[in-house]
């Protein structure tokens, strides 16, 4: 369970949105690849992602990832429409498999970074759990890789702001990904008339200097225009 703290500002800045990309290798389902190391032993592996048992409405019900001819990850009796998969390799040489199988409303049986350990792919960063308790339809993707750090964009239909996307930075330390900060930066917030981070205050809104503060710093008056910049995840 997380509590969200919103940081707001008053500067008006207009810019065109830029789609972020990460330094990864894209894999497609039902193809075999032999040019990449996914196990972390420094040698190239044979990897295949198989989507099978397609139903009348074109959804699949089975997902299998095999490495060197052996099953490393499997989902059965499930439902998804396609597979998005990428290999990301950190500066330290550790490879990870991003696997997302979306279904209705973007939800699906898996949206996670997987690490190959003892013959199996296991979740090391589950994008559906990062903001658990704050909203629905939680998914994410890696949008930048630099050294042993990744930037992820977490998309969610939140209880307070509706559809939005937030960037968080994680670093791989001692065998796991840990956030470098409790703060995330809003990439997009979708309002009724499109994407925006500017909102009109409907009623006087008290604000605080930090997430754990108890004393009100200032009050935003009804009708004032404000921009939401960041949020904090507090466990």
Model-derived segments and spans:
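Sec-dependent signal peptide cleavage junction
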Residues: 10-24
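Structural core positions within WD40/WD-like beta-propeller blades
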Residues: 45-49, 98
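Surface loop/turn motifs at the tips and blade-to-blade linkers of beta-strand repeat domains
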Residues: 27-29, 75-80
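A short beta-strand motif characteristic of beta-propeller blades
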Residues: 71-77, 125
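Residues in Ca2+-coordinating acidic/glycine-rich loops
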Residues: 36-44, 89-94
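Beta-loop motif signature
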Residues: 189-234
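Short aromatic loop motif centered on NTY/YTY
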Residues: 82-112, 120-196
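Bacterial N-terminal signal peptides
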Residues: 2-12
